[in-house]
Amino acid sequence: MSTDKTNQSWGGRFSEPVDAFVARFTASVTFDQRLYRHDIMGSIAHATMLAKVGVLTDAERDTIVDGLNTIQAEIEAGNFEWRVDLEDVHMNIEARLTDRIGITGKKLHTGRSRNDQVATDIRLWLRDEIDLILSEITRLQQGLLGQAEREAETIMPGFTHLQTAQPVTFGHHMLAWFEMLSRDYERLVDCRKRLNRMPLGSAALAGTTYPIDRELTCKLLGFDVVGGNSLDGVSDRDFAIEFCSAASIAMMHLSRFSEELVLWTSAQFQFIDLPDRFCTGSSIMPQKKNPDVPELVRGKSGRVFGALMGLLTLMKGQPLAYNKDNQEDKEPLFDAADTLRDSLRAFADMIPAIKPRHAIMREAALRGFSTATDLADYLVRRGLPFRDCHEIVGHAVKYGVETGKDLAEMSLEELRQFSNQIEQDVFAVLTLEGSVNARNHIGGTAPEQVRAAVVRGQELLAGR
């Protein structure tokens, strides 16, 4: 990347060139060049509008548009030289345009500042990123629905405090993650609505003296509405913070899911098997099969949390309007979007390939007195107050711990020593199937409800 030229667009009032280190220190082109497509898109719309209001001729507009399209092709072919001395993506493209088409290229920036230009670029870029992320969320949710449908009757232990609590189905467990991702989807859709306000036309901070048509530019760029205040237009980064907030919540969900997958693949659980293509080995221990994908996603969540805090800290002390501080908004935003999209892609590929180990999960559900609440509910139906039933079953569990017997393994005589309300029909209640089937209401773990929830989920995805 060249640094041997000094051709800043703002050099007129300066008596000496910028220090070479300062030029590198203040340049952003090393990372904001990824905005090139959206920068060119915004410039084409701006040139089109300038021609409509008579600031440019139609011929000048056409020359500019052709030049910008050629530059985009150069960039995408890898034939474009990014120059640090030109600071950023905007000036690199404008300088190249002027090289190609001459003085007409210098007219493109009429009625525009880099302040509103970059604010527009970032919004256009993030809008596209959100659309890609939403697609990955949907793909992951489709995988979860597939697992839930296949495993609607697969019983596993449900946990609280990571201790066995009650039996649930694996399908029901997968649907819990589906629900969280649905909220993530909604948050990102809402974020997209608020970012889709056009700042272009705000110029440096106060607007412009040219007779611009912001409504036309807004329509050309696909924004929903023109921003209503030029000061806010160039200085607002709420949309980036809101995106990083939504991304942080989504990554928190993926991190929690990752923790479960890491536990479930361990020798201590062995609930699931991950295909080899999602794992790696050890350079010293031949037996190792490490769940690197969920471990990395769990770790990468911290990067996105950091991006959120970085942007909040970046903005908290800035007066209106634009400040150079805002150059620091891009790297955390870019990284947060990349990390979330890659993590979702990894999960969307991996989740459909998970293979539950049915026998092991069932055996685990049989341990830990997982049907104790069912016994208490059984006694409630016999007319006893729940708190009394809770204490009765607590004594039965204590007896089970001492004798090494689960509730279903005790004889009727053993159970009746805790309550004479217990009859032979209690054993149907104490089975794993009896427990999950009894929770047959919307949101419950019964297989019938799992299948109904899958249908609702499929309808939700089809309506997007």
Curated annotation (Swiss-Prot):
Provide the alphabetized UniProt keywords. Amino-acid biosynthesis, Arginine biosynthesis, Cytoplasm, Lyase
InterPro entries, per database record? Arg_succ_lyase_C (IPR029419), Argininosuccinate_lyase (IPR009049), Fumarase/histidase_N (IPR024083), Fumarate_lyase_CS (IPR020557), Fumarate_lyase_fam (IPR000362), Fumarate_lyase_N (IPR022761), L-Aspartase-like (IPR008948)
**Sorted alphabetically, which SUPFAM superfamilies does this protein's record hold?**
L-aspartase-like
The reaction(s) this protein catalyses: 2-(N(omega)-L-arginino)succinate = fumarate + L-arginine
Give a GO cellular-component term. Answer: cytosol
Coarse class of the protein's main subcellular location: cytoplasm
Is Ligase included in the keywords of this UniProt record?
no
Gene3D superfamilies linked = Fumarase/aspartase (C-terminal domain), Fumarase/aspartase (Central domain), Fumarase/aspartase (N-terminal domain)
Disulphides: none
Specify whether Transcription regulation is a keyword of the entry: no
Q: What are its GO biological-process terms?
A: arginine biosynthetic process via ornithine; L-arginine biosynthetic process
Which pathway does this chain act in?
Answer: Amino-acid biosynthesis; L-arginine biosynthesis; L-arginine from L-ornithine and carbamoyl phosphate: step 3/3
Could you tell me the EC number(s) of this protein?
4.3.2.1
Location of the protein in the cell: Cytoplasm
Top-level taxon of origin: Bacteria
A GO MF annotation of the entry reads:
argininosuccinate lyase activity
State the family named in the UniProt similarity comment for this chain.
Belongs to the lyase 1 family. Argininosuccinate lyase subfamily.
Q: Which PANTHER family match?
A: ARGININOSUCCINATE LYASE (PTHR43814:SF1)
Recorded protein name is: Argininosuccinate lyase
- Give the organism the record lists: Pseudomonas savastanoi pv. phaseolicola (strain 1448A / Race 6)
Taxonomy of origin reads: Bacteria, Pseudomonadati, Pseudomonadota, Gammaproteobacteria, Pseudomonadales
